[in-house]
Amino acid sequence: HANQLVQTIRANLTKSLERAGVTILRGQGRLEGAQRVGLREPSGVDRVLNAKDVIIATGSDPFVPPGIETDGRTVFTSDEAINLEWLPRWIAIIGSGYIGLEFADVYTALGCEVTMIEAMDKVMPTFDPDIAKIAGRHLIDSRDIDARSGLLARKVTPGCPVQIELADFNSRELVETLEVDAVLVATGRVPSSKGLNLESLGIETNRGFLPIDDTMRVLVN
């Protein structure tokens, strides 16, 4: 049902763009100059397009910390979770940001046992304290989620079961090894800016983020 819904939305958006006069090209894009974009089509054919302005809107990718191995089935990111074809009885969610909270809400509603693992000394560490208190009461406490803070998932090994080495965040000493049916890695997202040939234009990123001015123009060295 979810896949069908996504296909319908994608088709409707495509039609809306085409009605607005937008030309849609499919392939892998890269910068070839200040007003030039290279495109590698699915067939392997390379093209170069000229444009007055170029907007970089490549989105983001899930961040997977060192030590965590994903296989897309028993250990997976939020991108892969929406296409998961099975329901784990017990799932550990690494990270307690908005993505982790959303999926914890979904999995508990589906009857899964959920353990939430947060490296910081409290869950939802980046939230406003008042919002975190309300969210914790409604999304964690009321759902009987086992939320653990101050623990670093220093190693995650896919399998049946998945093994998680939990270490004290400060000392890095092993606390316990947890065995669960699945692990969702929800430790944030990073800019999807690799492979755009930014360096050829003198654009230096900061952890993947593009430098911009007050009008959102990319800064070039």
Predicted segments with their positions:
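Feature captures the FAD/FMN-dependent oxidoreductase FAD-binding
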Residues: H1-A51, A147, R154-Q163, L178, ...
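Rossmann-like dinucleotide-binding cores of NAD(P)H-dependent redox enzymes
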Residues: Q4-T14, I82-N83, P88-A92, Y98-E176
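Glycine/Thr-rich phosphate-binding loops of Rossmann-like dinucleotide-binding domains
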Residues: G27, V64-P66, E102, Y107, ...
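Short hydrophobic core segments
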Residues: G29, V37, V48-G59, I93-I94, ...
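Extended, non-globular alpha-helical segments
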Residues: D53-T77
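Short glycine-rich hinge loops at helix-strand junctions in the catalytic core
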Residues: G59, G111, R143-D144, G202, ...
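FAD-site-proximal beta/loop scaffold in flavoenzymes
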Residues: D71-L87, L178-N221
